[in-house]
Design a protein with these regions (language model features):
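Single conserved hydrophobic/aromatic residue that forms the stacking wall/gate
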Residues: 231-234, 238-241
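Local cysteine-cluster metal-coordination motifs and their immediate loop/turn environment
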Residues: 210-233
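Ferredoxin-reductase
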Residues: 2-85
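FNR/FR-type flavoprotein reductase catalytic core
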Residues: 73-211
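Short glycine/proline-enriched turns and hinge-like loops at secondary-structure junctions
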Residues: 21, 35-37, 99-101, 216-217
Length: 241
């Protein structure tokens, strides 16, 4: 069985759910069921050379849910795609999170790093989910997390909703309640989370947000520097991390 492939997906819906954030649902009975939590889909955008990497928010009954933010011309074109269109997608890509039975996980998402935490939460038992946004206009997926049975904590940078502060403020208070942490979001946030986990002696898995080209580890466009055992080397975000 193939781990990934390029195929056409039927666009079922593409709706705006927050300021500049869209919820796209595409159907392909062969590839959608292969997606694991923390993986991503590489979406071809007409008139653009490079695909757009979008994290898998959910996968159920042959339908991939892709929640994305409009940041440039490519995602702007994506937001204008209509129901019934055929979407060219390379999926599923990336390693994803490794979830073990018997562990309680803390899942942390910042901004557009929140969507992949929903599918991850559905694979966990009673997860603690901490979501962070700049303000109330960018808040997404709160009801979805509650339906998934998560203990949910909302934070905003400006205090316009939920707790006024950062996700790390909540993590410091609750890290003793969990066995492991999984996180996705801006790099400074991930660094801060990793530092908290290191101090508490808790394992931590992170999913980086980087610009990508091939999505399979060949072109090195998304390479970042990270420590491997005892030395620093380049890792491909799409394939290694």
């Amino acid at each position: 069985m193939k781990k990934y492939d390029v195929q056409k997906f039927e666009l079922l819906s593409n709706e705006q759910i927050a300021d500049g954030i869209f919820d796209m649902r595409v159907k392909n009975d062969e590839l959608a069921p292969l997606a694991k939590c923390g993986q991503f889909a590489h979406v071809y955008v007409p008139s653009k050379t490079l695909r757009r990497p979008i994290s898998v928010c959910d996968s159920e009954n042959g339908v991939l849910r892709l929640v994305y933010q409009v940041k440039g011309e490519g995602t702007k074109i994506m937001s204008e795609m209509k129901k019934g269109e055929s979407v060219d997608i390379l999926a599923p890509l990336g390693n994803g999170f490794k979830i073990e039975k018997g562990k309680r996980y803390c899942l942390i998402g910042g901004g557009i790093g929140v969507p992949p935490m929903l599918y991850t939460a559905k694979q966990c038992e009673n997860p603690l989910v901490i979501t962070g946004f700049r303000n109330k206009d960018l808040i997404i997926l709160q009801d979805d997390f509650k339906k998934a049975g998560a203990e949910l904590v909302l934070t905003t940078d400006d205090g316009s909703a939920g707790i006024h502060g950062f996700v790390t403020d909540v993590l410091k208070e609750k890290i003793s309640e969990v066995d492991e942490v999984c996180a996705c979001g801006p790099t400074p946030m991930l660094k801060a989370i990793a530092d908290v986990c290191k101090e508490a002696g808790k394992p931590c898995q992170i999913s980086l947000e980087e610009r990508m080209a091939c999505g399979m580890g060949a072109c090195l466009v998304c390479a970042v520097k990270a420590v491997s055992y005892t030395h620093l080397r380049a890792h491909e975000t799409c394939a290694d991390l």
